[in-house]
Regions:
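Flexible hinge/capping segments at coil-to-helix
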Residues: 2-43, 130
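Short beta-strand->loop
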Residues: 4-14, 101-114
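Hydrophobic hinge/microswitch elements
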Residues: 60-107
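Short alpha-helical
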Residues: 45-46, 75-76, 94, 115, ...
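A late-sequence structural motif
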Residues: 105-148
Length: 151
């Protein structure tokens, strides 16, 4: 193996929408999302892989949605969601502040749970391996000081 991989924390994936979206703050069945536009990262990204895995686990596919938009950055997803262009699935820790500020809302899905490990990865035996280990220690120390964030 050419890489070192260390788990930092576990994060929940949630469904997000604009606060003005008809499903904002509601609890729905997965299929109730289908009439809406789905916004997601481009094929080949980890986010895309996670989304396809989530949808597959619930007998869904991107083609079950009324339409979909594939974009290149998470910031573009956030902006489109805030503008009520559609809904998306993202790591909760990435949008927590926007949820707290009320510029985004969560759609709760019956019997839906999706957690992923967030890892720190670097090339083994690289010139920067020792600095990466030091940075990893700093990250772990910082995250442990925050306690259980329910990320």
């Amino acid at each position: 193996e050419d890489y070192e991989c260390h788990e930092l924390f576990e994060s929940e994936t949630i469904c997000i929408c604009a606060p003005t979206h008809p499903l904002a703050g509601k609890t729905v069945d997965f299929k109730e999302l289908n009439p809406y536009r789905l916004i997601f990262r481009e094929e080949g990204s980890k986010s895309y892989f996670n989304l396809r895995s989530i949808l597959h686990g619930y007998n869904q596919d991107i083609h079950n949605f009324a339409s979909f938009v594939e974009v290149g950055t998470i910031n573009t997803i956030h902006n489109l969601v805030i503008e009520n262009v559609g809904l998306s699935f993202v790591y909760k820790f990435v949008v927590q502040k926007k949820l707290d500020l009320g510029v985004m809302s969560q759609i709760f899905i019956n019997d839906f749970k999706s957690k992923n490990f967030i890892n720190y990865v670097w090339m083994k035996n690289s010139f920067f391996a020792e600095k990466n280990r030091e940075f990893l220690d700093i990250c772990k120390h910082y995250l442990s000081s925050l306690g259980d964030l329910n990320l």
